[in-house]
Regions:
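Auxiliary Fe-S-binding modules of radical SAM enzymes
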Residues: 71, 81-84, 88-218
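Radical SAM/AdoMet-radical enzyme domain recognition
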Residues: 1-79
Length: 218
């Protein structure tokens, strides 16, 4: 991977509980995944990030992920679930609750001043640990004013905001043989119309996206 030019690896890992991992992924290989990410993290060429969506995990599951940062240069990032598609279940964990739990266990937390990537994650580090803990808290700590993302779905639809179903059908433009200049203008127009903020906390705000994240894509 390094010879091919790869210098960063992101791994989606919501739990290291073997049975829960199998239910989520359909595969019984969580130990293999753990060995692989530790192998990458122990090589200075790679920056390894674990993305964990906060669902209904037990604290022990989150703590097990956090413990990886004790001896390895790994960033464990906790992502608050957004009410999109099936993601409407009330989550039990938030950024503040995780930090409170760590402090209750006697851990000293400090903010990480170093810029890690270009995304919205906010990072902290436990005193004495090698790795970091990141939070992408779209619900409890909005970062819409810093959002620099649009998404292109598998069926060619450009979305300026995850919450809303509005956007631009680029696939239709391609199929109608629109010129490169016309497509460029449509993309620019879509970006300029990017909403100032999401309102996912208000289920009555209207225009809520009904597709699942797996359909929208990353």
């Amino acid at each position: 991977l390094h010879q091919a030019g790869t210098d960063g690896i992101n791994i989606s890992l919501d739990t290291m509980d073997p049975e829960k991992y199998r239910k989520i992924t359909g595969e019984n290989c969580v130990e293999k995944v753990k060995r692989a990410l530790i192998c990458c993290a122990d090589k200075e060429q790679f920056q390894v990030k674990i993305n964990c969506v906060l669902l209904d995990q037990e604290w022990e599951e989150l703590s097990e992920l956090i413990e990886l940062t004790r001896t390895h240069r790994i960033s464990v990032r906790f992502i608050e679930q957004m009410p999109i598609g099936h993601g409407t279940v009330e989550q039990s964990w938030t950024e503040e609750r995780i930090k409170e739990q760590l402090k209750a266990e006697g851990k000293t937390l400090k903010a990480v001043s170093e810029k890690l990537g270009n995304g919205p994650a906010y990072y902290i580090q436990i005193k004495g640990y090698k790795g970091t803990i990141g939070f992408i808290s779209a619900m409890s700590h909005k970062f819409c004013d810093k959002c620099n993302r649009v998404r292109l779905t598998a069926d060619g639809f450009l979305k300026p905001c995850l919450q809303y179903g509005k956007g631009t059908d680029l696939l239709k433009l391609l199929r109608t043989k629109a010129s490169d200049e016309e497509i460029r203008r449509e993309i620019e127009d879509c970006i300029y119309k990017k909403p100032h903020s999401h309102h996912m906390e208000d289920r009555k705000s209207g225009g809520i996206e009904t597709e699942n994240m797996a359909e929208i894509g990353g």
